[in-house]
Regions:
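Extended, small-residue-rich solenoid/repeat segments and analogous flexible loops
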Residues: 1-45
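Flexible, glycine/small-residue-enriched loop-and-beta-strand segment within the central core
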Residues: 37-48, 53-126
């Protein structure tokens, strides 16, 4: 798996507000419903098929180099969290219940002496 190491001298940084416009998506199909309270980060790397439903307060966390693709007719429940650092592809006509989290990266365990947030980050597609 490819890995990326964060500069240990960098501190916390904001990813932005999550506010978006439909025109910012890489591609968005017809009849897409995005309920109030949904946050979207890096919409330029997100493709939404036609007839997609995204429930209230879901978070689509695109990534500057990863891609997120959500297929036609897919239903995403309220308060879901999707992170696409390692690429995330959800097929057509998939139902995802409320509160589901799909994360495509993790901090590798490097021993008790190294804090987890200082360990390397690994990515994998889902």
């Amino acid at each position: 798996m490819p890995s990326e190491k964060k500069n240990s001298n960098s501190g916390p940084r904001s990813h932005g507000s999550g506010n978006f416009r439909r025109t910012q998506f890489k591609r968005i199909g017809k009849s897409v419903i995005i309920e109030p309270g949904v946050l979207v980060f890096h919409p330029e790397n997100i493709v939404l098929g036609s007839n997609v439903y995204i429930g209230h307060y879901a978070i689509l966390k695109g990534y500057h180099r990863g891609q997120m693709k959500i297929g036609d007719g897919t239903w995403i429940g309220q308060q879901c969290f999707f992170h696409s650092a390692g690429n995330l592809i959800i097929g057509k006509y998939v139902g995802i219940g409320p509160g589901v989290k799909i994360i495509t990266s993790f901090h590798a365990e490097e021993g008790i002496a190294k804090p987890i947030l200082k360990s390397r980050i690994e990515f994998a597609p889902v």
